[in-house]
Amino acid sequence: MQILDNTISRLKKSKPLKGVTLGFCLHITKETSVLLIVAKELGAKVACCGGNPLTTQDDIAAFLASQGIHTYCWAGQSPKEYDWCIQQVLNHKPQILTDDGSDMNVKAHFDKKYNSLKIFGATEETTAGVNRIRAVEKQGKLRYPVISVNDAYTKHMFDNKYGTGQSTIDGLSLIHI
């Protein structure tokens, strides 16, 4: 973490994301909150919604909002409310999207209201979301590049190896025999 902290401290001074609006549709947890806060500290305007209505942590969402991050999510949203939250993020006119499941990417591609957005790229976290994006590409309707995080070599090197191990240890520590 020290290397990451030093890098962020150095970059905060130059604000490399100043003038960039980022839209996030992710599980709103303490882990993802770090990403959102760092993006804001690096100068970005940040808007987020929960990537899954069942995983949003309300205390984290409230904290993000208190930090000046445009936050549209709460636990237990209905499908209609979930869609409304995605629309609110897109209404901020993000230039880069970070998505988990491609709900926001699909809406940006097929809802005519968002055709004028100047999105120059996105990331997708899940295999299911990447499959949805590939279907958009096969239709010839992909308007901007989308990076598949799941296919990244570093994800296989670190997240799959160490993240899975850490999750196993965390799960075992919760078992009370």
Predicted regions and their residues:
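N-terminal ligand-binding/catalytic initiation module
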Residues: 1-156, 162
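Phosphate/ATP-binding catalytic cores across multiple sugar-kinase/actin-like superfamilies
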Residues: 171-172
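Conserved small/polar residues in nucleotide/adenosyl-binding loops
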Residues: 175-177
